[in-house]
């Protein structure tokens, strides 16, 4: 008898008949977004083994690995129009972009298994709206759930103000949904209490790139194919952007410089192939590495001087376009403030004057070999025999900007710029990306109505975590995210949420609408909080323990949706089966609630389908790099729906921003490229400077300095480093290839849930030996000094938001954080550094990370956890090899 969750392999899959429905979509997971085809046909019918008898057009059996075939993980049975249907979801073998020939990752290779099927663990999907009665979630109607929420929301907004009504939301689950959510929160209600899933505030990620004038997703996949050297900071594209790496980066003979404390599979492969250099850096010290590399380049005159002369702003150009007004927004005052701003001459002097840029000093701070640093500088910048510079592209991700947010990303941008990268083929500077780009906001800018201020009383985005910890939120709607596990100081955040919700004496006792209102009114008036949660599955602990109202959400495959990947390629994600039960997409839920709130009097929430939302969003895309307005206008002129016009582009899609040339829609391969031929402006085309130049007033990039001793950084860094006397190690976190985000789908997929049934942490053998830890042991990680920022500190003087001053002013609280996980002991980790699995709700690694934002950006330093490792027993997987492989990841 097999266990309920045990993976049982199958050796057969039904073939789609010739008349099967064929729809296109893209992968729901990583930012690469490989193109897929969905074959759908009624149960009771199958195709034959001959090519003429099946929709795949192939003879079976065959031995073509990259040919047309489906594995058991690519098949499921779903409901379509209330009738059982087979679906096969396979990578598009005819694809010529993104995943040529049908290449894909293990994540995309199991897409079919995410579809709802009551015969497997997807039966755990939320299917009905629910209200928590006597501690138990009870199914109710959509009307009652939204009326209850509207009743208490109207009361809270009227008595406590819109800032007491909060939203914590995904930023990527399709244009239609994100637009609807932001329209409600930022425009209709106008609350500043809003934050994205991965941040405590509605901020940008790699702010240093933004300030330099570089769009985080300026590059195309062909740039990563065409470069001769890839400098990869805080990222292994194989693990997290698999097809970008295997289809576009591995072919050829390009070299790879990996800056990460973890030798993941991509790193190990490149080193073994003689094409890689691994720089196992101490977390948070990338800025010093960048300065040391820049110094070597400058001292040897390897910089791309013609590029610098043409494309780097001088001191006058840095200040151009501002007039006499207050530099109030972040990018304005940061790029015109002497600590960071520079031109080429000033930057050169700065680099040569920094003690930390000296090779021996940098090697000591970063923990790297001086020889390796020198080799990296040669690879990325040393001119060839003919005098030409290597075509180097620079990619950063979370290991870079989520450790020292502003300085790492700013110094990274400057390093790339002096190497002549940023706006030409094969020589780009970009993020690698995490999730796909499904965020288009309705605007409103209410997030700037924050009680906090940057130094000089400049406006600062709203810190939702801090606002909650201070007890200022009376209602919070959590949409598609694991708020607790994803944020810093997770244990303290969870405890505060629990005290405001589940531990309140005011709990719903019946489904009488009036009684519910009185109960929730009493709770909020006594300082408590009401919570609602929209998601696919019950989310620990927000949905399972705290939420008073829970909404079931329809997502990938259950409605027509749109979004872009990391090269801004827009595609339609086709609906191909029925959502379970009464589950509805976010846009529909928002609309239902808005109507109950009386916010639809102008017809602003009267969408009939997702296409209505898509067409409305189009005009809000016009001023950005995701502009698809010309497509919507062309569809309107042709008398068809915009989503249907996009459907015709299949898995190829079209790269935004979209423009018209000769009456045809044309995509944009890369941004900032002066070779982009825009010609005359046609139709609804919007021509912005960032398409042919850098995104600054002058169109030239800004070189940013990054002084290691900047008080806003160094004081925090010294406070949170591992303490040798306590036996602490760095505790960072990251992803592995097989899983996605919090594992919300993976836990319901038989093979993947068996491969990774629980959270895990990679530990170097030296660190494990000291604690008697072996692979398969349960380990508790404890940090007895987790710093939590409190209050709403006002920045007047430059020093006001530095760590020491916050501590002196009583704005830092000290707590303890801990999480339990399973050890994987391997030399793939640098000694003194452990890496826990990212965002596991039952094992939140962020519990040991301090919740003190970067004072320059208001972003957390997610990767800088620390803790003591304590063995607490053996897991059931230590001696049972049917589950959870404990093999290292640097085996290639």
Swiss-Prot record:
Its main location: periplasm. GO terms for biological process: respiratory electron transport chain. It is found in: Periplasm. Its cofactor is [3Fe-4S] cluster; Mo-bis(molybdopterin guanine dinucleotide). Residues 431-452 are annotated as: Disordered. InterPro entries: AioA/IdrA_3Fe-4S, AioA/IdrA_lsu, Asp_de-COase-like_dom_sf, MoPterin_dinucl-bd_dom, Mopterin_OxRdtase, Prok_molybdopt-oxidoreductase. Its EC number is 1.-.-.-. Pfam families: Molybdopterin, Molydop_binding, Rieske_3. It comes from the Bacteria. Keywords: 3Fe-4S, Iron, Iron-sulfur, Metal-binding, Molybdenum, Oxidoreductase, Periplasm. Residues 431-442 have a biased composition (Gly residues). GO terms for molecular function: 3 iron, 4 sulfur cluster binding; metal ion binding; molybdopterin cofactor binding; NADH dehydrogenase activity. GO terms for cellular component: membrane; oxidoreductase complex; periplasmic space. [3Fe-4S] cluster binds at residues 27, 30, 34. Induction: Abundantly expressed under iodate-respiring conditions. Involved in iodate respiration. Probably catalyzes the reduction of iodate (IO(3)(-)) to hypoiodous acid (HIO) and H(2)O(2), using a reduced cytochrome c as the electron donor. NCBIfam families: arsenite_ox_L. Belongs to the prokaryotic molybdopterin-containing oxidoreductase family. This is Iodate reductase subunit IdrA. It comes from Pseudomonas sp. (strain SCT). The gene is idrA.
């Amino acid at each position: 008898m097999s266990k309920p969750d045990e993976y049982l392999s199958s050796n057969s899959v039904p073939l789609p008949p010739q008349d099967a429905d064929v729809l296109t979509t893209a992968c729901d997971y990583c930012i690469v977004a490989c193109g897929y085809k969905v074959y759908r046909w009624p149960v009771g019918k199958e195709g034959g083994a001959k090519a003429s008898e099946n929709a795949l057009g192939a003879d079976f059996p065959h031995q073509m690995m990259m040919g047309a075939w489906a594995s058991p993980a690519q098949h499921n049975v779903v409901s379509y129009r209330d009738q059982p249907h087979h679906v096969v979801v396979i990578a598009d073998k005819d694809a010529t972009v993104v995943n040529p020939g049908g290449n894909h990752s293990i994540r995309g290779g199991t897409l079919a298994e995410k579809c709802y099927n009551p015969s497997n663990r997807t039966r755990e999907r939320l299917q009905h709206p629910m209200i928590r009665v006597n501690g138990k979630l009870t199914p109710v109607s959509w009307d009652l759930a939204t009326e209850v929420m509207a009743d208490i929301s109207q009361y809270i907004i009227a008595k406590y103000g819109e800032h007491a009504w909060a939203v914590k939301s995904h930023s990527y689950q399709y244009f239609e949904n994100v637009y609807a959510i932001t329209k409600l929160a930022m425009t209709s209600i106008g609350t500043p209490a809003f934050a994205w899933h991965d941040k405590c505030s509605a901020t940008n990620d790699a702010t240093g790139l933004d300030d330099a004038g570089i769009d985080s997703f300026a590059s195309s996949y062909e740039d990563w194919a065409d470069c001769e050297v890839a400098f990869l900071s805080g990222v292994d594209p194989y693990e997290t952007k698999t097809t970008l790496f295997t289809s576009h980066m591995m072919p050829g003979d390009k070299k790879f410089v990996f800056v990460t404390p973890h030798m993941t599979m991509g790193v190990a492969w490149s080193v073994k192939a003689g094409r890689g250099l691994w720089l196992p850096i101490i977390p948070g010290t990338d800025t010093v590495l960048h300065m040391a590399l820049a110094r070597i380049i400058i001292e040897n005159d390897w910089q791309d001087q013609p590029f610098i002369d043409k494309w780097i702003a001088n001191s006058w150009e840095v200040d151009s376009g501002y007039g006499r007004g207050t530099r109030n927004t972040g990018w304005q005052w940061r790029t015109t403030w002497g600590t960071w701003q520079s031109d080429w001459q000033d930057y050169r002097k700065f680099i040569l004057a920094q003690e930390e840029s000296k090779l021996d000093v940098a090697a000591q701070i970063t923990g790297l070999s001086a020889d390796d640093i020198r080799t990296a500088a040669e690879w990325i910048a040393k001119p060839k025999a003919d005098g030409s510079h290597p075509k180097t592209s620079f990619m950063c991700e979370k290991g870079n900007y989520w450790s020292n947010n502003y300085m790492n990303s700013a110094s990274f941008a400057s390093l790339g710029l002096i190497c002549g990268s940023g706006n030409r083929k094969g020589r780009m500077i970009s993020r690698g990306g995490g999730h796909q780009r499904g965020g288009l906001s309705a605007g409103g800018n209410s997030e700037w109505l924050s009680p906090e201020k940057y130094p000089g009383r400049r406006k600062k985005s709203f810190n939702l975590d801090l606002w909650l910890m201070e007890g200022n939120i009376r209602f919070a709607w959590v949409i598609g995210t694991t708020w607790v596990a994803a944020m810093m100081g997770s244990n303290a955040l969870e405890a505060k949420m629990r005290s405001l919700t589940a531990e309140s004496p005011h709990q719903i006792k019946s489904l009488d609408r009036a009684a519910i209102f009185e109960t929730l009114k009493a709770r909020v008036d006594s300082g408590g909080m009401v919570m609602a949660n929209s998601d696919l599955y019950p989310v620990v602990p927000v949905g399972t323990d705290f939420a008073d109202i829970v909404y079931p959400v329809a997502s990938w495959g259950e409605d027509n949706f749109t979004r872009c990947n990391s090269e801004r390629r827009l595609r339609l994600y086709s609906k191909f089966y029925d959502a379970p039960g009464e589950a509805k997409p976010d846009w529909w839920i928002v609309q239902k609630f808005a109507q109950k709130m009386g916010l639809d009097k102008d017809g602003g929430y009267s969408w009939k389908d997702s296409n209505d939302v898509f067409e409305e969003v189009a005009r809000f895309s016009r001023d950005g790099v995701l502009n698809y307005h010309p497509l919507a206008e062309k569809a309107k002129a042709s008398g068809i729906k915009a989503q249907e016009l996009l459907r015709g582009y299949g898995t190829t899609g079209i790269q935004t921003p979209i423009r018209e040339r000769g009456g045809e829609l044309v995509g944009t391969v890369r941004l900032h490229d002066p070779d982009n031929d825009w010609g005359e402006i046609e139709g609804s085309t919007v021509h912005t400077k960032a398409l042919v130049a850098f995104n600054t007033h002058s169109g030239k990039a800004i070189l940013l300095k990054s002084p290691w001793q900047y008080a806003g950084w160094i004081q925090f860094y010294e406070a949170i480093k591992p303490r040798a006397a306590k036996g602490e190690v760095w505790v960072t976190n990251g992803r592995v290839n097989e899983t996605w985000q919090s594992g919300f789908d993976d836990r319901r997929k038989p093979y993947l849930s068996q491969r990774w049934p629980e959270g895990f942490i990679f530990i170097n053998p030296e660190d494990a030996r000291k604690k008697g830890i072996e692979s398969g042991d349960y380990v508790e990680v404890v940090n007895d000094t987790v710093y939590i920022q409190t209050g709403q500190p006002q920045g007047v003087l430059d020093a006001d938001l530095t760590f020491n001053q916050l501590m002196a002013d009583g704005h830092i609280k000290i707590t303890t954080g801990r999480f339990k996980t399973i050890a994987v002991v391997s030399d793939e980790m640098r000694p003194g550094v452990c890496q826990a699995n990212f965002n596991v709700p039952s094992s939140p690694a962020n519990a040991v990370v301090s919740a003190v934002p970067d004072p320059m950006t208001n972003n957390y330093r997610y990767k800088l956890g620390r803790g003591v490792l304590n063995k607490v027993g053996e897991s059931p997987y230590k001696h049972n090899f049917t589950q959870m492989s404990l093999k290292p990841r640097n085996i290639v």
